[in-house]
Amino acid sequence: MSLSIDVTSLPSISSSIFKNESSSATSTLSGKSIGRSEQYISPDVEAFNKYMLSKSPEDIGPSDSASNDPLTSFSIRSNAVKTNADAGVSMDSSTQSRPSSNVGCDQLDFSLNKGINVSANLDSCISISTDHKKEKSKKDKSRKHYPRIEADSDSEDYVLDDSDSDDGKCKNCKYKKKYFALRMRMKQVAMQLIEDL
């Protein structure tokens, strides 16, 4: 797997700050320009004094004292009048607003060129085991299949014995054969139940 990252041009930022001049800050990315142009007037004591002295005391109202600091209030109102925040400025037009000399101008221009190459080899081994015990459902567990027991037996397999019978009362009667067959069948059922438990 190979990953290649090439950053040839990052946004170029230029900024110029001038006293009593327009200040422009622009950035470009993928050919698109985003700009904002604002004009700020720094507080000037002389201009503030002229402004206040040109007005009569009767004309000075609450609008002239919007701030506790009259000098700041004057700067805020002047800034609000001369601000144009909706103007789009491109990189080309921002250079035209700069003066010919760099006196009183703080300028910052930078660009970054980087080439990054990353290569990596991925080796993977996956083994899947599909051996698992098949779980029986609850219905299958509750329903046990017992082997079928045949009740019919040949008379030759059973020896009729009169030892446990009353003397002279049951000698080779027809029920004795059925009794031994039933006893053998019950014995098999009992053994099967014991094995299941």
Swiss-Prot record:
Cited Pfam families: Rota_NS26
Q: Name one GO molecular function term.
A: ATP hydrolysis activity
| InterPro entries (alphabetical) | Rotavirus_A/C_NSP5
- Which GO CC annotations does the UniProt entry carry? host cell cytoplasm
The Swiss-Prot or TrEMBL record lists the needed cofactor(s) as:
Mg(2+)
Q: How is it modified after translation?
A: O-glycosylated. Hyperphosphorylated on serine residues, when in dimeric form. Phosphorylation by host CK1 is required for the hyperphosphorylation of NSP5 dimer.
Residues bearing Phosphoserine are: 67, 153, 155, 163, 165
Superkingdom as given in the UniProt entry: Viruses
Q: Which UniProt keywords apply?
A: Glycoprotein, Host cytoplasm, Magnesium, Metal-binding, Nucleotide-binding, Phosphoprotein, RNA-binding
Chain segments carrying region Disordered? 17-36, 131-166
According to the UniProt entry, which residue ranges have a biased composition of type Low complexity?
17-33
Residue spans of biased composition, Acidic residues class: 152-165
Any one GO BP annotation for this protein: viral genome replication
Tell me the compartments it is located in: Host cytoplasm
Q: Where does Mg(2+) bind?
A: 92
Family, similarity comment: Belongs to the rotavirus NSP5 family.
Described function = Plays an essential role in the viral genome replication. Participates, together with NSP2, in the formation of viral factories (viroplasms), which are large inclusions in the host cytoplasm where replication intermediates are assembled and viral RNA replication takes place. Orchestrates the recruitment of viroplasmic proteins such as capsid proteins to these factories. Participates in the selective exclusion of host proteins from stress granules (SG) and P bodies (PB). Also participates in the sequestration of these remodeled organelles in viral factories.
The subunit field of the Swiss-Prot or TrEMBL record says:
Homodimer. Interacts with VP1. Interacts with VP2. Interacts with NSP2; this interaction leads to up-regulation of NSP5 hyperphosphorylation and formation of virus factories. Interacts with NSP6. Participates in the selective exclusion of host proteins from stress granules (SG) and P bodies (PB). Also participates in the sequestration of these remodeled organelles in viral factories.
Q: What's the protein here called? A: Non-structural protein 5
Organism classification, top ranks?
Viruses, Riboviria, Orthornavirae, Duplornaviricota, Resentoviricetes
